[in-house]
Every structure is written in structure tokens, then in C-alpha cells.
Regions:
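Membrane-interface helix caps and helix-loop-helix hairpins in membrane proteins
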Residues: 58-67, 182-183, 376-381
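Long extracytoplasmic/lumenal interhelical loops at the membrane interface
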Residues: 121-125, 255-269, 281-325
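A membrane-periplasm/extracellular boundary helix in multi-pass inner-membrane enzymes
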Residues: 115, 183, 204-259, 267-277, ...
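Membrane-interface micro-motifs in multi-pass membrane enzymes
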Residues: 5-14, 68-72, 132-146, 188, ...
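Selective detector of the "anchor" transmembrane alpha-helix that sits immediately C-terminal
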Residues: 324-346, 394
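Alpha-helical transmembrane segments of multi-pass inner-membrane proteins
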Residues: 15, 19, 49-57, 74-78, ...
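Transmembrane signal-anchor hairpin modules in multi-pass inner-membrane enzymes, especially those
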Residues: 1-53, 63-64, 88-98, 153-169, ...
């Protein structure tokens, strides 16, 4: 709904009702098990949420930040804590995946058919998924979450008692979802799927989390040390966005002439300047869109730059947290991502666990990795369509860890 309401129908009213119901259930039943807080991922989520509340109190736009905080609390309570409770029955894990896969496939197939009628042109690819998704990038980010799940059901469907026919259906679903990502013309989603494939091989090699963390730290340090040389090399790429998929892929690193990439750099520069001004608490959750305009440098402005804040946000989860919640906000948000990876790897590498649990967790990890990589270039965690798989995938991993130490549970 437009007109300033900013309401997404029918999902947000449904989330509100579930939020009220779950709160009432907890108050009446008194069944609050706080033991799962000992799991590092849960602790990291609560710390991030707690710091967000502090930055609401120090916000430069208190009511805007309060509204943002409440919206995030709805998503977290329903898609993480409520689903965590539901997922103690493993049957609901299969249903969660199946229903979302079937529904997503219908939307993607419908979008592809419409796009086919326009010769799969890039221009139409940016809006063809409406009214289901407002933007091609959030559409692609959502689909990328479920590609590993569809592939897992295809290859490991026997662990879930799926028939050969059902596994063939999931194979078709996998192809449809991959086609959806490709013809979304979303370069960040393409990169995220490649990153998920690379991460899968790390899992197969049983690379430990500490080794991955050290490697990521080395890459980050190397970038800051050699950033001038890296940027100079990237400036040599003049390939612009194009209908041709290969040329469009080559434009990923074009920071000289590609408007989308240039505007992304502009938004990041604004976020850094905002961080330097308020490094501890930031400007407040949900305020970047309204505050970044004065920090734009004239030399960074592009054809799609705006002062009205109506064309996207920070274009990065990480820069967004940095500008809105300061350094602690960024570190706490990154800690959530890292703790989820650590928990996932721990489950996958536990040989005493049943095969279906390791397979599910592998798919969850790969799905989350697609978003963590995509999050460098876009930020959608405050959208319900992304919040559902983001928090839902984490909830499943925590449920597997908490409810089934050395499980004998079967998925039927």
C-alpha cells in the first residue's frame, strides 16, 4: 500500500497477528525456555537486538528508529523465536521448505513466462516480477536462498522419504529457480550463488570455521592494504550493464562508467562519512535514507543519484549497520552471520548426527551464504520476504542443535 502507509499486504498484517498471538501464548502458558540462549548464535542475535534498542534511544530521528525497531522485532520474534518453537517437530521443517519452494516456483515460473514474452530483455527484467516483488534484486536474493534447498531435496530426497517422482519435481524446481536468478539480471545474486558453490567445496573438504575466519580476515586486511591498487585495476573495466548475459556479468567490477555501481560507491562513501561523524551510536536504525543526502560529494553524483531518498538505501547491510548503529552495531551484526556459519559447520561435521540433519544444515548454510555475500552489495533484511528465510534458516539450525543432541528423530 502506498500513500505513505508503507504497508505490505497481506504479509505484514499476518505477521502482526502472529506476533500478538505468540506474545499472548507466552504470557498465558509461561513456557519460556531460556536454555537455548547458551547457543552463541542466539546470544549474538540478542546482543545485536539489544544494541539496536540502545541506538534507538540515541537516534537523530527517534520515532523513525522506533518504528524500524518494532518492525525488526516482529520479524525476529515470528521468523526466529516462533519458528524455533515450531521446528522442534522435524515434520514442520520439511513442510516449511516444501511450501516455500512450491510457492516460490509458481512466482518464478510466472515471471519467466512474462519475461519470455519480452524476449528476456534486461529492461523488463527489472520490473517483470511485480506485484510479487517490488524490485529485481530482492527477487533474486530471495530465490537464491532456496536454490541450495531445492538441490538438496533433489539429491538427498531419500533422507526425507521423497519418492523418485518428487525428487524429479524438485530437480525441475531447481532449474526454474536458477533460471529465475539468471534472468533477474542481478549481478549480486549471480556472485552469491558462485560463493555458495565455493563454500560447498569448503564443507566437503571439512575446512574448520577458524580457518575460514582467518582467511576472511586476511582478505579484509589485504583489501585495506592494497585498496588503491585494487581500485585502479577495477577502473580499467569499462563494460557496462547490457542485455547480453556475458557482458552484463563482466560489468560487475565496472566502477568507472556503470551507473548502478557508481551510485553504490556514492552511497557507501556517504555511509562512511556518517560513521565518522557518529562512530559509536550512529544516526539511528532506519535513518540512513533520510540523512545521507547532505553527505554526497558532487564528484560522486550519478545519473540516478537523488536527495529525496526514494531510490534505495545504503546498498550494503554492512555499511548500513555502520552508519545507523556505529561500529558496535556493525560488529554485532557480523557476529550474527559468523555465529550462524560456526553453528552450521559444527552440526554438519558432527558424524553422530543423522544424515538428514547434516544435509538440511548444509543447504541452510549455503542459502545463508548467498545472502551474506549479496549483503555486501544490497540490504534487504528489513523486508519480510528476506527476513523470513534469513531468520527462518537460523531458527532451523538452532532447533537442530538444541532439540536433538544425538538424535533418533526421523522426518516422515
Amino acid at each position: 500500500i502506498g500513500g505513505g502507509f508503507g504497508l505490505s499486504l497481506p504479509t505484514e498484517p499476518m505477521i502482526w497477528l502472529l506476533y500478538i498471538y505468540y506474545g499472548y501464548y507466552l504470557l498465558v502458558s509461561g513456557k519460556i525456555n531460556i536454555e537455548f540462549i547458551k547457543i552463541p548464535l542466539v546470544a549474538a542475535i540478542l546482543i545485536n537486538f539489544g544494541w539496536m534498542f540502545i541506538t534507538v534511544c540515541t537516534s537523530t530521528m527517534f520515532f523513525t528508529s522506533l518504528k524500524y525497531f518494532l518492525a525488526r522485532s516482529w520479524f525476529m520474534v515470528i521468523f526466529f523465536f516462533f519458528l524455533f518453537k515450531i521446528f522442534q517437530n522435524p515434520l514442520f521443517i520439511r513442510r516449511f521448505f516444501s511450501y516455500l519452494l512450491y510457492g516460490s516456483t509458481i512466482v518464478v515460473f510466472y515471471t519467466l513466462v512474462k519475461h519470455y514474452g519480452e524476449d528476456f530483455s534486461r529492461g523488463w527484467g527489472y520490473m517483470i516480477m511485480r506485484p510479487f516483488f517490488s524490485d529485481h534484486t530482492i527477487y533474486a536474493a530471495y530465490i537464491a536462498f532456496f536454490v541450495p534447498v531445492a538441490v538438496m531435496f533433489t539429491l538427498r530426497g531419500n533422507f526425507f522419504n521423497f519418492s523418485v517422482f518428487h525428487r524429479l519435481v524438485f530437480a525441475v524446481i531447481s532449474l526454474v529457480l536458477i533460471a529465475g536468478v539468471i534472468f533477474s539480471y542481478t549481478r549480486a545474486a549471480w556472485i552469491s550463488l558462485l560463493a555458495a558453490i565455493a563454500f560447498y567445496f569448503l564443507i566437503k573438504l571439512k575446512v574448520k570455521f577458524k580457518s575460514i575466519l582467518i582467511a576472511l580476515s586476511a582478505v579484509a586486511i589485504g583489501f585495506f592494504i592494497y585498496q588503491d591498487k585494487i581500485l585502479y585495476s577495477l577502473e580499467a573495466n569499462k563494460k557496462g550493464s547490457a542485455d547480453d548475459l556475458e557482458a552484463h556479468a563482466q560489468s560487475v567490477s565496472n566502477i568507472t562508467t556503470d551507473p548502478s555501481n557508481l551510485e553504490r560507491m556514492n552511497r557507501w562513501n556517504c555511509a562512511m562519512m556518517m560513521f565518522r561523524e557518529k562512530p559509536v551510536f550512529g544516526f539511528g536504525p532506519g535513518t540512513y535514507t533520510f540523512k545521507y543526502a547532505p553527505y554526497q560529494n558532487s564528484k560522486d553524483l550519478t545519473l540516478i543519484s537523488t536527495n529525496s531518498g526514494d531510490l534505495g538505501n545504503t546498498h550494503s547491510e554492512y555499511f548500513n549497520s555502520l552508519s545507523e548503529m556505529g561500529l558496535i552495531g556493525l560488529l554485532s551484526w557480523v557476529s550474527v552471520f559468523l555465529c550462524s556459519i560456526a553453528l552450521g559447520l559444527q552440526i554438519v561435521y558432527e558424524e553422530k548426527r543423522e544424515a538428514w540433519q547434516r544435509s538440511v544444515t548444509t543447504a541452510l548454510l549455503l542459502g545463508l551464504v548467498t545472502y551474506y555475500v549479496h549483503a555486501f552489495l544490497n540490504n534487504y533484511s528489513d523486508f519480510d520476504k528476506i527476513a523470513a528465510p534469513l531468520w527462518g534458516f537460523m531458527a532451523i539450525m538452532v532447533a537442530i542443535k538444541f532439540y536433538w543432541k544425538y538424535p533418533e528423530v526421523k522426518v516422515k
